[in-house]
């Protein structure tokens, strides 16, 4: 991808990068290990973002 990109695309990529985090440890501890993953985890190679 080019380094020069539209602002809207840059914002979308930044938001997707922030959302792509694991479940916090305190949530795993609070739920007794029942909640370990969330469905919005995305791998840059496997899943694509909407244009």
From Swiss-Prot:
Cystine bridges: none
GO MF, one example: structural constituent of ribosome
GO process annotations (BP): translation
InterPro entries: Ribosomal_eL39, Ribosomal_eL39_CS, Ribosomal_eL39_dom_sf
Matches recorded under SUPFAM superfamilies: Ribosomal protein L39e (SSF48662)
One GO cellular component term: ribonucleoprotein complex
Pfam families, per database record: Ribosomal_L39
Keywords, comma-separated and alphabetical: Ribonucleoprotein, Ribosomal protein
HAMAP family: Ribosomal_eL39 (MF_00629)
NCBIfam families from the UniProt entry: PRK01242.1
Family assignment from sequence similarity: Belongs to the eukaryotic ribosomal protein eL39 family.
Protein name: Large ribosomal subunit protein eL39
């Amino acid at each position: 991808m080019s380094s020069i990109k539209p602002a809207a695309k840059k914002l979308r990529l930044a938001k997707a990068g922030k959302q792509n985090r694991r479940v916090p440890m305190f949530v795993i501890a609070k739920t007794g290990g029942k909640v370990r993953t969330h469905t919005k985890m995305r791998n840059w190679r496997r899943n694509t973002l909407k244009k």
